[in-house]
Swiss-Prot record:
The gene is SHE2. Its main location: cytoplasm. It comes from Saccharomyces cerevisiae (strain ATCC 204508 / S288c). This is SWI5-dependent HO expression protein 2. InterPro entries: RNA-bd_She2, She2_dom_sf. The lineage of its organism: Eukaryota, Fungi, Dikarya, Ascomycota, Saccharomycotina. Pfam families: She2p (PF11435). GO terms for biological process: intracellular mRNA localization; mating type switching; mRNA transport. Homodimer and homotetramer. Interacts with LOC1, MYO4, PUF6, SHE3 and with RNA pol II subunits RPO21, SPT4 and SPT5.
Length: 246
């Protein structure tokens, strides 16, 4: 972000950061909750013991991420006695960069987990159990993909709108979409690919807060829809499998 348009660390921006992190924590917690239920049911299926071990590893990783998110305190960057107009006040970049890095880390992990959970594992379940008792519903897979896509786009927006982009903050799925568009000669202005939609830089704290609030509403809705589908599939697992006696 250019210095003449620098957003400073203020109580308002710190509150905004807390809201952003709360969304990420909720996203992580949703997976941790449903996967723990899934792992519990998989104990009953000896042929899926290796798949269960893989999911346990993913849950441990997500739990670690969530602990990191919950322990982050943006208010530590507020300089006592300084306001956002003070040239010595910390730039918002100092607070948002580690958050952007965490978002990138999390969505890249979700990319791997979602592929395993919605594709590879579904095939293994069908081939090893010969039934669909422990599979995901089609609706839950759609919700998983939709939520992931919007969290990727939010991460992209957070980075590019503040002009803090770096190849170390690039997201593979976005870079792949850009590469394919270049090779195909796609008109980015006419595509409906969410990853290719233009992101404009913000020039003030107020603008960033306004757009963040809009994103918060969108992601809140996506997470609510995801939780509903996770509840449906967890109920399915319980009705089909959870009532069996050990």
């Amino acid at each position: 972000m250019s210095k003449d348009k620098d957003i400073k660390v203020t109580p308002g921006t710190c509150e905004l950061v807390e809201q952003i992190l709360a969304l990420l924590s909720r996203y992580l917690s949703s997976y941790i909750h449903v996967l723990n239920k899934f792992i519990s049911h998989l104990r009953r299926v000896a042929t899926l013991r290796f798949e269960r071990t893989t999911l346990i590893k993913f849950v441990k990783k997500l739990r670690f991420y969530n602990d990191c998110v919950l322990s982050y305190n943006a208010s530590e960057f507020i300089n006592e006695g300084k306001n956002e107009l003070d040239p010595e006040a910390d730039s918002f970049d100092k607070v948002i960069l580690p958050i952007a890095s965490m978002f990138v880390k999390c969505v890249e992990t979700f990319d791997l987990l979602n592929y395993y959970l919605t594709q590879s594992l579904q095939k293994e379940i069908l081939s090893k159990t010969l039934n669909e008792d422990l599979t995901l519903t089609a609706e839950s897979i759609l919700a998983i993909d939709d939520t992931y896509n919007h969290f990727v786009k939010f991460s992209q927006w957070m980075i590019e709108s503040l002009r803090i982009g770096s190849n170390l903050l690039d997201l593979e799925v976005v870079q792949f979409a850009i590469k394919c568009a270049d090779e195909d000669g796609t008109n980015i202005g006419e595509t409906d690919n969410i990853f290719l939609q233009e992101i404009l830089p913000v020039n003030s704290e107020e603008e960033f807060q306004t757009l963040s609030a809009a994103w918060h509403s969108i992601l809140d809705g996506k997470l609510s829809a995801l939780d509903e589908e996770f509840d449906v599939v967890a109920t399915k697992w319980h009705d089909k499998f959870g009532k069996l006696k050990n």
